[in-house]
Every structure is written in C-alpha cells, then in structure tokens.
Amino acid sequence: MKKIGRGIGLSFYGTGYGNGFPDVSKARVRLLEGGKVGIYVGGTEVGQGAKTVLTQIGAETLKMPVEDIVFVHEDTVHMPDAGTAAASRQTYNTGNAIRVACENFRNKLKELAREHLALNSIYGLKVENGKIYLDFFPQKSLSFEELFEKSSKGDIEAEGEFVAQTVMMEEETGQGAPYWPYTFNACGVELEVDTLTGLVEIRKAVFAQDVGRAINPHLVEGQMDGGFAMALGYVLFEDLNLKEGKINNNKFSKYLIPTAMDTLEIEKIIVEDPESTAPYGAKGIGEPTMIPVGPAILNAIYDAIGVRITELPVTPERLVKAIQEHEKEKGEVK
C-alpha cells in the first residue's frame, strides 16, 4: 500500500565560529596594470560561489564593473588569512573584510588623486567606473590606469580586517549572542511511502530561506538545491557501515547517494531581510540549507504511516521493520 504524508521542518543557524574562538577575516586590495583592481583573500572556493559573491561585494564598494576585478585566493603565502570556508562565514566575514579594504582603498586613491590633480583636499572626490573625479567639476579626473602609470607601480594597495562580534552567555540567565548573525529557514515536503517495499519518494518540496539580502539570487537557489539534495542523501540513502574504524561499504555501489533521478525541482522562496551588520545585508547560507530538510521528511513519514523513525538513514529495510513492529504493537494492544 502507498500512503501520502506531509511534513514541515524549521531551523535557525548561527553563522561563524561563535564564542571562544577568534573569528577574523582579512583582505587586501591592490591597483593593477590596465586600471584593474586585485582582491586578495585566503578564503577557499569549494564550489559554493564565494569567489563570485566576494567579487560582487568588492565591485559594488568600488563602484566598478565586476569584469575589472581580479580575484585571487587560496595562496597562503601572498595573501592575508580569511579563515576557513566553514560555518557559513565567508560571505559575512570575508565580505565585510573586503568591504573595509575597498573603502580604505578608495580613500587612498582619493589622496593620491588629490596630489596629482593639485587639489586642496579629497572633499568632493568620487570613485566610480575606474576613475577618480571631482563631483562638481568632472573635468578634474584621473583614471585608475593613469594613476597606476603615474605612481610607483604595484604599491597602491590597502587592507581590511573584520572581527565577528559575539556576546558571551551570562552564567545566571543563559542569555547572550554566542553567534552572529543568525539565519532562518523552513522546508515542507510531500512524499509517498510504499509500506510493502519501504521505498520513500519525495513528490513535492517547498523551501524558504532567509538570506539577509540575495547578492546573487542564482547562487542562493543553487545552495538551496544543493542543501536539499545533500539532506536527501543523509536521510534516505547514505548508510555508513563502520567496523573497528574501517569503512566496509567504501564503493558507490554499496554507499548510495542521491542521483538526478532521486532529486526533484523544489519550489524555492528567497526571503530577504537585510542584516544591518552584513556586507550589503547578505548572510551566509552554506550549512543552513541542509538542516530543516531531514525533520521535514521524517515528519512527513510519520504523517503517512504513523511511525516515528529515530535512526538515519531511513532505508527501506529499516522502514519496513518499523512498520511491522508498529503493526505488531497495535495487535498486542487490541
């Protein structure tokens, strides 16, 4: 018999390392030949889209096209440490460090332009589209390329640092802010349970994710799709068989992960509520997108068959066994 169930899962997630561990990101910005700008951070791009979003943050702060930004990362010798690509912290922490570095860089450009343009001060100077100009007299201007040629090449740079703010928990009240910021989400699924075979099929899913501000909506949707697929594997497929510290099912023929046939097109709702301390309001959503999916699936299974599953993954064998035990208990009660 096939039964339909619906379930909802909710979560909130504190980004960053949290209390008790220094959470620091640093960035360097440098003027390059041809008027391009290099952004240097020791943060890792693992496919989550950090390189794209961090480039966009730099381009927005410098008011220049993203095509003119050269993003350099993952070189621990020549660039400042931006911390790990973990705890959903790169967009918020390193994004803030880049914003600060770009603001310092803008001020440095204004000072240099003031000297070359023989101006009294930097007041009225604007930095946009690869040039520095006087707002009320635009003829007084200097392009990034011209400034690079006029200066000692390679020495026009600035750095920025961001340290995440947290509040230690009060011992008596338990109140505090061990992480900041927090992100929130919700997931709802409709699924079908085959009570004979134990197979579970997700029929429909809706996912709502708070992102602060979606700097790159396509990447946000990609994170939501990826988090859902990863959680699907965690809940229904990936059964790690360990014995004496050794993985027994170390082949994909034995350790199953979701394929394109197992996933589905989910309805994605991006919730924007800009975070005041974040770079242009954006928050990280790496890990959070996975968290509510499991509870939603487990609640939907319970809704379908009336059995609470407390062991993951919910393999067909475990599900059939749980159903049989539940039926046996009902029979004994009668």
List the model feature ranges, each with a label.
Residues M1-K334:
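Cofactor-binding beta-sheet edge motifs in enzyme active sites
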